[in-house]
Curated annotation (Swiss-Prot):
Keyword Ribonucleoprotein included in the entry's annotation: yes
InterPro entries: Ribosomal_bL27 (IPR001684)
Record GO terms (molecular function): structural constituent of ribosome
Region feature (Disordered): 1-25
Protein name per the record: Large ribosomal subunit protein bL27
Source species, domain of life: Bacteria
Disulfide cross-links: none
Similarity comment: Belongs to the bacterial ribosomal protein bL27 family.
NCBIfam families the record matches: L27
Species the sequence originates in: Desulforapulum autotrophicum (strain ATCC 43914 / DSM 3382 / VKM B-1955 / HRM2)
Gene: rpmA
Gene Ontology biological process terms from the UniProt entry: translation
Length: 84
């Protein structure tokens, strides 16, 4: 004979994995072609010279060189890669 009332089941207990977004290479760092510079949602940072953008807005280097973050007007930022 049970002396404890059955406990209800909870609907919590899940947590999704982190998506690991953010800047991967900072200004002044040297990169090789294909290196990921920024993982982002939307164009928080725009691609500059020698930088490509993937379909998920990932910015990557097209050449070997040095990373430089620049302002594009008053409210936009962009990242470029210049030959070392």
């Amino acid at each position: 004979m049970s002396h404890k009332k059955a406990g209800g089941s909870t609907r919590n207990g899940r947590d999704s994995n982190a998506q690991r977004r953010g800047v991967k290479k900072f200004g002044g760092q040297t990169v090789v072609a294909g290196n990921i510079l920024v993982r982002q949602l939307g164009t928080k940072i725009h691609p500059g010279s020698n930088v490509g953008m993937g379909k998920d807005y990932t910015l990557f280097s097209k050449i070997d060189g040095v990373v430089a973050y620049e302002r594009k007007g008053r409210d936009k930022k962009r990242v470029s890669v210049y030959e070392a």
